[in-house]
Structures are given as C-alpha cells and as structure tokens.
Design a protein with these regions (language model features):
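Short glycine-enriched, charge-decorated loop/helix-capping segments at active-site entrances
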Residues: 38-43, 141-147, 214-223
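Auxiliary Fe-S-binding modules of radical SAM enzymes
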Residues: 2-14, 171-249
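Canonical Radical SAM [4Fe-4S] cluster-binding loop centered on the CxxxCxxC motif
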Residues: 1, 7-49
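Short acidic donor-binding/metal-coordinating loop in glycosyltransferase active sites
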Residues: 74-75
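Conserved alpha-helical substructure of the radical SAM core
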Residues: 38-70
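Conserved AdoMet/S-adenosylmethionine-binding subsite of the radical SAM
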Residues: 59-69, 78-205, 212
Length: 249
C-alpha cells in the first residue's frame, strides 16, 4: 500500500524508546501556533512510499535499531490509517516495535467503520505518544484552531484498549497557567496506561520555514520557553498526577 510522507529520519532519538526509524506523514488538519513543520499541512502533497519498502529498509539496518523501532509522526499520521495498518502489521510480523505520535484529532468515537480500523491498528501498536496541546477547551482552540474533545476522548479510548501511553505537552509562555497544568496532571493521572510524560519547551526553530513558505508566523514576538520553565511546568503536572493517584489509594 502507498502512503505519503513529508520526510523520514533514520536516527530518531526523541520519538519513542531507543533509536527510531521515523516517518513524518504528510497532511494535518490542525494549525498549531507553534507548529515547526507547516510544510506537512497540505493533504495532497508528500512523497509516495510503499509499506514494504519501508520495512525492507528498516530490516536491512535492524541491528542499528536493536533497542528501538518504527515511529510514525506528522503531520497527523492517523489521517493515513489504512497505510499504518499495513505497515504496522508487517512490522509486527518481524518483531519490530511500533509507535504512533499523534494529536488524536482524527478520533471519531461514533464512526463505527473508523473504530473498527482503529481497533485493528491498535492490535499492531506497541506505544502511542499523544500530544495533548492544552487541557482547557478555549485555550486549545486558540492554540490549534480545533476543540480538544477528540484528543481527550482518544486518550480514554487508549486506556480502554490498554495501549501503553506516552503523553507530550509543549509549554508556551502566556498559554500555560498553573491551574491548567495541574488540571492536565489530574486528567492524565486517571489514565492507568500512562507510561511516560514529556513536557517540552516551545522553540522558534520553525520560523525560517514560515518565511520560506510566505506564511505569517503566528507566535511572532513570543520568546522560546526555557528548559527551567518547562521543568517547572512538568513539576506542576506531576503534582496533579500524584494528587489523583494518592486519592485512589
């Protein structure tokens, strides 16, 4: 089956456990203000690739990835769910660890046909990295142009399916108040399948791409978030997690 990618990386170290072979899928319905890959937005672009060719390339270098696997990110990878099913099915036949890095924005709880395909994909998925952009609905819409209803419902779906979950959150100065971070911690603290938490500082490395594409940069004038601020935010989220889990005991 053919999929459409923006690019690929053969030495990914931040996209799941170990060294990863990373596919950046083409197409995304979100318009995150801090997106550093605006060239992945178009739905009809990208390089055509065959799932069997991806597996062959990985397998030929499998000793290099002995503690890693394949990660699909984006763009929004779940827009190409049928390609992912075929790719991950073939990967699992060879014992390759599989990971999806997603915003969860495509989740459609009431779409029976979609749920069946998603259920099938999850049987071949070892880890989901879910980017929760913001816990507050209004702030989420300001940051992404979309509601956070689907991403949060997707998180609960993953718990129901007992798919290991790795939460990611980007800290943007002026958008992440303490009460929001604590509430995010309370939400993810209730997820029994939570395996890891990444709190990442907003950076400005994507500014050049916006200039090249002649797109106004939406966070012009907003400073990059410091590592210290990101760690402070993570500590607040962790307090929210611990408060929920302590109450359960």
């Amino acid at each position: 089956m053919t999929g459409y990618i923006h690019s690929k990386e053969s030495f990914g170290t931040v996209d799941g456990p170990g060294i990863r072979y990373v596919l950046f899928m083409q197409g995304c319905p979100m318009r995150c203000l801090y997106c550093h890959n605006p060239d992945t937005w178009k739905m009809n672009g990208g390089e055509a690739v065959k799932s069997e060719d991806i597996i062959e390339e990985y397998w030929n270098n499998r000793h290099f990835y002995h503690d890693g696997g394949i990660t699909v990110t984006g763009g929004e990878p779940l827009l190409q769910i049928d390609f992912l099913i075929e790719l991950f099915r073939a990967a699992k036949e060879k014992g390759i660890h599989t990971c999806i890095d997603t915003s969860g924005i495509t989740y459609a709880e009431k779409d029976v046909a979609y749920r069946k395909r998603l259920d099938l994909l999850m049987t071949y998925t070892d880890l989901v990295m879910l980017d929760i952009k913001h816990i507050d609905p209004d702030c989420h819409r300001r940051l992404t142009s979309r509601s956070n209803e689907r991403p949060l419902a997707f998180a609960k779906y993953l718990e129901e399916k007992n798919v290991p979950l790795w939460i990611r959150h980007v800290v943007v100065d002026g958008y992440d108040k303490e009460e929001h971070l604590y509430a995010l911690g309370e939400f993810i603290g209730r997820l029994s399948n939570l395996r890891a938490l990444d709190v990442l500082p907003y950076h400005t490395m994507g500014v050049t791409k916006y200039k090249e594409l002649n797109i106004p940069y939406p966070l012009e004038g907003v400073s990059a978030t410091s590592r210290e601020r990101a760690q402070e935010a993570k500590n607040i989220i962790l307090r929210g997690i611990y408060s929920v889990r302590k109450a359960k005991k």
